[in-house]
Design a protein with these regions (language model features):
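Short acidic, glycine/serine/threonine-rich loops at helix termini
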Residues: 9-12, 36-43, 142-144, 170-171, ...
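Conformationally flexible catalytic loops at phosphate/diphosphate-handling active centers
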Residues: 25-120
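Redox- and metal-dependent alpha/beta enzyme cores, enriched for Fe-S-associated oxidoreductases
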Residues: 126-151, 167-172
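Metallocofactor- and cofactor-centric catalytic cores in central/energy metabolism, strongly enriched
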Residues: 160-169, 182, 200-209
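Phosphate/diphosphate-binding loops
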Residues: 194-205, 216-220
Length: 227
């Protein structure tokens, strides 16, 4: 999230998707920006939010909660052979959450006229070079793209990652213009000793076997060497 309004909008998406998907969700945003500036925004009406709540999921959540009236165990110890299977089995629920998040983004878009997606594209429709990034840095990148495309005739674009986990490779590929030849990935973290940072490695894996497989890929620690 970049601006106060986006924090509020996507905060609603995170809460609604958590209820429907039965999984906790981490909603992160630029805390410095939102706490050091004033913006006029139209706040959500609770009745509008109430219309989008899955009340059957809320009821099921309350029934699953620890309660002495209907006791059950949670977090029981397991042997390695069964724990491994259960950890793999739960991955399905995480993958399904991506569709739930996209569904609530669409509902929010319909109500307030926004265009939130798991991956939003900004820039020239026929861009040859794009950046993949997340967070408040996208605001600066957008301004730079506008200037360079208008003043210097470049064809640049930006893919903004709004949903990082679960990472939907197909949604990323859909967001990239078919004319793309070079991709630079800006990560939010540094992992010394790793072949690459998390977002970069996700992008590499997502593009494998697609029309963008031969695109030049760059990351912050390999600016002078295509990978």
């Amino acid at each position: 999230c970049i601006r106060d309004r986006q924090v509020m909008d996507l905060g609603a998406v995170a809460h609604l998707a958590t209820i429907a998907g039965k999984l906790p969700m981490l909603h992160f945003f630029d805390g410095f920006r939102t706490s050091h500036e004033n913006q006029k925004i139209e706040t959500w009406d609770y009745d509008e939010l109430k219309e989008m709540v899955d009340w059957n999921a809320v009821k099921a959540f309350r029934e699953r909660a620890l309660n002495p009236v209907h006791p059950h165990s949670m977090g029981a110890a397991e042997q390695p052979e069964t724990f491994f299977q259960h950890r793999e089995a739960c991955n399905t629920a995480y993958l399904e959450t991506a569709d739930i998040v996209a569904e609530y983004m669409d509902k929010v878009n319909a109500k307030i006229g926004t265009d939130y997606k798991p991956f939003n594209y900004y820039g020239a429709p026929d861009a040859t070079e794009i950046i993949v990034a997340m967070g408040s840095v996208c605001d600066t990148i957008e301004e730079t793209i506008d200037y360079l495309n208008e003043k210097e005739g470049t064809k640049l674009g930006l893919v903004k990652v709004r949903l990082y986990r679960p990472f939907r490779a197909d949604k990323l590929v859909e967001a990239i213009p078919s004319t793309c030849e070079q991709i630079s990935v800006l990560d939010r973290t540094k992992e010394p000793g790793s072949e690459g940072e998390p977002l970069y490695l996700d992008v590499v894996a997502a593009l494998k076997g697609t029309q963008f497989h031969d695109c030049l890929l760059y990351t912050s620690d390999a600016a002078d060497e295509a990978r």
